[in-house]
């Protein structure tokens, strides 16, 4: 079980660009990492196979995974997720606040509140900023288990 990193991502910019961004970002959650940096299909298939195997063998007393040889096999794409998203899993408990109209009535601001495993998803925010250069992204994060926080 990870330490959870709390994230607040503020996105601000022209109304039409924010509306386009919100449509693009929405997938399995309002801010789906997979939309910005897609999780490889090969890992998705392995995840499904591992889940099916686990369900089929649940409760077996003659199998102890801890006794199996350590071969470096990674059925869940853990290393890929950490390298490409900056965290073990996609965002969880994602909530969208807004949009709120700016003072000039030509801009909008939205805030995504979400949790990630162990660390903030900096690579995902960097990719979003490259795809939407007209928007301003600000990520505030706090991980209370190891006592670190930051602004990105």
Descriptions of predicted regions:
Residues 1-152:
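Long, contiguous binding/interaction regions
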């Amino acid at each position: 079980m990870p330490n959870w990193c709390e994230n607040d991502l503020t996105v601000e910019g022209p109304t039409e660009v924010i509306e386009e961004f919100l449509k693009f970002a929405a997938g399995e959650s309002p801010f789906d990492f997979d939309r910005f940096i897609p999780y490889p299909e090969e890992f998705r298939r392995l995840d499904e196979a591992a889940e099916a195997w686990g369900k089929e063998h649940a409760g077996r007393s003659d199998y102890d995974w801890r006794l199996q040889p350590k071969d470096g096999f990674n059925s869940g794409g853990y290393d890929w997720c950490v390298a490409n998203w900056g965290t073990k899993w996609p965002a969880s408990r994602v909530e969208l606040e807004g949009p709120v109209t700016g003072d000039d009535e030509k801009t909008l601001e939205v805030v995504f509140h979400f949790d990630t495993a162990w660390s903030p998803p900096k690579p995902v925010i960097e990719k979003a900023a490259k795809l939407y250069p007209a928007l301003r992204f600000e990520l505030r994060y706090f991980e209370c288990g190891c006592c670190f926080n930051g602004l990105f």
